[in-house]
Protein backbone atom coordinates (compact mmCIF):
# COMPACT_ATOMS: atom_id res chain seq x y z
CA UNK A 1 0.00 0.00 0.00
CA UNK A 2 1.40 3.37 -1.03
CA UNK A 3 -0.08 6.23 0.98
CA UNK A 4 0.65 9.93 0.63
CA UNK A 5 0.29 12.70 3.20
CA UNK A 6 -0.86 15.77 1.30
CA UNK A 7 -2.50 19.13 1.82
CA UNK A 8 -1.87 22.88 1.69
CA UNK A 9 1.45 24.38 2.85
CA UNK A 10 1.89 25.25 6.52
CA UNK A 11 -0.46 22.51 7.69
CA UNK A 12 2.04 20.53 9.76
CA UNK A 13 2.44 17.73 7.21
CA UNK A 14 6.15 17.16 7.84
CA UNK A 15 5.89 16.78 11.61
CA UNK A 16 2.71 14.69 11.25
CA UNK A 17 4.35 12.39 8.70
CA UNK A 18 7.49 11.98 10.79
CA UNK A 19 5.33 11.19 13.84
CA UNK A 20 3.29 8.67 11.86
CA UNK A 21 6.48 6.94 10.71
CA UNK A 22 7.68 6.80 14.32
CA UNK A 23 4.32 5.39 15.45
CA UNK A 24 4.41 2.65 12.82
CA UNK A 25 7.95 1.69 13.83
CA UNK A 26 6.90 1.60 17.49
CA UNK A 27 3.83 -0.51 16.72
CA UNK A 28 6.04 -3.07 14.95
CA UNK A 29 8.95 -3.08 17.39
CA UNK A 30 7.98 -6.06 19.53
CA UNK A 31 5.99 -8.02 16.97
CA UNK A 32 7.28 -11.38 15.69
CA UNK A 33 6.31 -10.46 12.12
CA UNK A 34 7.61 -7.17 10.78
CA UNK A 35 5.54 -5.75 7.93
CA UNK A 36 7.92 -4.50 5.21
CA UNK A 37 7.70 -0.73 5.57
CA UNK A 38 9.47 2.37 4.24
CA UNK A 39 8.94 6.05 3.56
CA UNK A 40 9.59 8.13 0.47
CA UNK A 41 9.95 11.92 -0.04
CA UNK A 42 8.10 13.16 -3.12
CA UNK A 43 9.12 16.84 -3.00
CA UNK A 44 12.50 17.35 -4.69
CA UNK A 45 12.89 20.74 -2.99
CA UNK A 46 12.19 19.62 0.59
CA UNK A 47 13.94 16.99 2.70
CA UNK A 48 12.16 17.78 5.97
CA UNK A 49 11.19 14.22 6.88
CA UNK A 50 14.77 12.97 6.75
CA UNK A 51 15.90 15.99 8.78
CA UNK A 52 13.20 15.41 11.41
CA UNK A 53 13.84 11.67 11.71
CA UNK A 54 17.62 12.10 11.83
CA UNK A 55 18.19 15.21 13.97
CA UNK A 56 21.79 14.28 14.77
CA UNK A 57 22.85 13.86 11.15
CA UNK A 58 23.87 16.55 8.70
CA UNK A 59 20.74 16.43 6.54
CA UNK A 60 19.85 19.45 4.44
CA UNK A 61 16.19 20.38 4.94
CA UNK A 62 15.86 22.33 1.68
CA UNK A 63 17.30 21.60 -1.74
CA UNK A 64 18.14 24.32 -4.26
CA UNK A 65 16.49 22.62 -7.22
CA UNK A 66 13.48 23.43 -9.37
CA UNK A 67 10.43 21.31 -10.02
CA UNK A 68 10.32 20.05 -13.59
CA UNK A 69 8.23 17.42 -15.34
CA UNK A 70 11.32 15.25 -15.68
CA UNK A 71 12.12 15.41 -11.97
CA UNK A 72 8.50 14.69 -11.08
CA UNK A 73 8.50 11.64 -13.36
CA UNK A 74 11.74 10.44 -11.74
CA UNK A 75 10.19 10.75 -8.27
CA UNK A 76 7.04 8.97 -9.40
CA UNK A 77 9.13 6.13 -10.85
CA UNK A 78 11.04 5.73 -7.57
CA UNK A 79 7.75 5.76 -5.63
CA UNK A 80 6.21 3.21 -8.00
CA UNK A 81 9.23 0.91 -7.67
CA UNK A 82 9.00 0.65 -3.87
CA UNK A 83 7.80 -2.87 -3.18
CA UNK A 84 7.33 -2.78 0.59
CA UNK A 85 3.86 -3.65 1.88
CA UNK A 86 3.48 -0.12 3.28
CA UNK A 87 5.13 3.02 1.92
CA UNK A 88 4.47 6.45 3.45
CA UNK A 89 5.21 9.47 1.23
CA UNK A 90 4.97 13.20 1.86
CA UNK A 91 3.74 15.39 -0.98
CA UNK A 92 4.45 19.01 -1.97
CA UNK A 93 1.87 21.50 -0.70
CA UNK A 94 0.87 23.14 -3.96
CA UNK A 95 -1.40 21.48 -6.50
CA UNK A 96 0.57 21.57 -9.75
CA UNK A 97 1.10 19.36 -12.79
CA UNK A 98 4.23 18.02 -11.07
CA UNK A 99 2.23 17.10 -7.97
CA UNK A 100 -0.28 15.16 -10.05
CA UNK A 101 2.59 13.21 -11.60
CA UNK A 102 4.24 12.18 -8.31
CA UNK A 103 0.86 11.14 -6.88
CA UNK A 104 0.11 8.68 -9.68
CA UNK A 105 1.50 5.55 -7.93
CA UNK A 106 -0.41 6.25 -4.68
CA UNK A 107 -3.20 3.98 -3.48
CA UNK A 108 -4.46 6.29 -0.74
CA UNK A 109 -3.98 9.74 0.75
CA UNK A 110 -4.20 11.38 4.15
CA UNK A 111 -5.32 14.98 3.60
CA UNK A 112 -4.10 17.43 6.23
CA UNK A 113 -5.09 21.11 6.09
CA UNK A 114 -4.59 23.89 8.59
CA UNK A 115 -7.70 25.50 10.05
CA UNK A 116 -7.55 28.59 7.82
CA UNK A 117 -7.36 26.50 4.65
CA UNK A 118 -9.91 23.79 5.33
CA UNK A 119 -11.72 24.79 2.15
CA UNK A 120 -8.73 23.54 0.14
CA UNK A 121 -9.48 19.99 1.24
CA UNK A 122 -12.02 19.86 -1.58
CA UNK A 123 -9.29 20.57 -4.13
CA UNK A 124 -7.19 17.74 -2.74
CA UNK A 125 -10.20 15.42 -2.75
CA UNK A 126 -10.68 16.23 -6.45
CA UNK A 127 -7.02 15.49 -7.19
CA UNK A 128 -7.35 12.17 -5.36
CA UNK A 129 -10.51 11.24 -7.25
CA UNK A 130 -8.92 12.14 -10.59
CA UNK A 131 -6.02 9.80 -9.80
CA UNK A 132 -8.25 7.03 -8.39
CA UNK A 133 -6.69 7.50 -4.95
CA UNK A 134 -8.69 6.57 -1.83
CA UNK A 135 -8.99 9.23 0.88
CA UNK A 136 -7.82 7.32 3.96
CA UNK A 137 -8.15 10.20 6.44
CA UNK A 138 -8.96 13.91 6.53
CA UNK A 139 -7.50 15.98 9.34
CA UNK A 140 -7.63 19.66 10.24
CA UNK A 141 -4.56 20.96 12.06
CA UNK A 142 -4.79 23.74 14.62
CA UNK A 143 -2.07 25.79 16.28
CA UNK A 144 -3.51 28.75 18.18
CA UNK A 145 -7.23 28.24 17.46
CA UNK A 146 -9.50 27.76 20.46
CA UNK A 147 -10.54 24.26 19.45
CA UNK A 148 -10.00 20.86 21.00
CA UNK A 149 -8.31 18.04 19.07
CA UNK A 150 -10.24 14.83 18.62
CA UNK A 151 -12.15 12.65 16.21
CA UNK A 152 -15.26 14.02 14.50
CA UNK A 153 -15.90 10.69 12.75
CA UNK A 154 -13.57 7.95 13.96
CA UNK A 155 -14.76 5.40 11.38
CA UNK A 156 -13.87 7.80 8.54
CA UNK A 157 -10.72 9.01 10.31
CA UNK A 158 -11.86 12.63 10.21
CA UNK A 159 -10.93 15.01 12.99
CA UNK A 160 -8.79 17.79 14.41
CA UNK A 161 -5.17 17.47 15.49
CA UNK A 162 -2.96 19.94 17.31
CA UNK A 163 0.01 20.99 15.20
CA UNK A 164 3.52 21.39 16.64
CA UNK A 165 6.61 23.32 15.61
CA UNK A 166 9.54 21.49 14.06
CA UNK A 167 11.73 22.53 16.98
CA UNK A 168 9.32 20.79 19.36
CA UNK A 169 9.50 17.61 17.30
CA UNK A 170 13.30 17.81 17.23
CA UNK A 171 13.32 17.92 21.03
CA UNK A 172 10.67 15.32 21.84
CA UNK A 173 9.57 13.56 18.65
CA UNK A 174 5.93 12.50 18.53
CA UNK A 175 5.70 12.93 22.31
CA UNK A 176 5.67 16.69 21.69
CA UNK A 177 2.03 16.39 20.64
CA UNK A 178 -0.77 16.69 23.16
CA UNK A 179 -2.12 13.39 24.45
CA UNK A 180 -5.19 13.35 22.19
CA UNK A 181 -3.30 14.09 18.97
CA UNK A 182 -0.57 11.61 19.90
CA UNK A 183 -3.21 8.93 20.43
CA UNK A 184 -4.91 9.77 17.11
CA UNK A 185 -1.64 9.41 15.21
CA UNK A 186 -1.01 6.03 16.85
CA UNK A 187 -4.54 4.92 15.95
CA UNK A 188 -3.96 5.87 12.30
CA UNK A 189 -0.70 3.89 12.38
CA UNK A 190 -2.59 0.89 13.75
CA UNK A 191 -5.27 1.22 11.06
CA UNK A 192 -2.64 1.28 8.31
CA UNK A 193 -0.90 -1.82 9.66
CA UNK A 194 -4.21 -3.65 10.03
CA UNK A 195 -5.17 -2.71 6.48
CA UNK A 196 -1.89 -3.98 5.06
CA UNK A 197 -1.93 -7.17 7.13
CA UNK A 198 -5.51 -8.09 6.25
CA UNK A 199 -5.74 -6.43 2.82
CA UNK A 200 -9.21 -5.22 3.72
CA UNK A 201 -10.69 -2.08 5.26
CA UNK A 202 -9.66 -2.02 8.94
CA UNK A 203 -12.22 -1.71 11.67
CA UNK A 204 -11.83 1.43 13.78
CA UNK A 205 -9.25 1.03 16.54
CA UNK A 206 -10.72 1.81 19.93
CA UNK A 207 -7.45 1.57 21.83
CA UNK A 208 -6.32 4.58 23.78
CA UNK A 209 -2.65 3.69 24.07
Q: Can you describe what each PLM-predicted range is?
A:
Residues 3-26:
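Glycine-rich phosphate-binding P-loop
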Residues 157-208:
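NTP-dependent small-molecule kinase module
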Residues 63, 81-96:
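Switch II (G3) loop of P-loop NTPases
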Residues 27-48:
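Short beta-strand-centered segment that lines the nucleotide-binding/catalytic pocket of NTP-utilizing
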Residues 93-177:
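Conserved catalytic-core segment of NTP-binding enzymes
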Residues 50-67:
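Conserved NTP-binding/hydrolysis module of P-loop NTPases
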Residues 2-4, 36, 84-88:
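Residue-level preference for the first positions of well-ordered beta-strands
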Residues 30-33, 77-84, 101-105:
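Flexible, charged surface loops at secondary-structure boundaries
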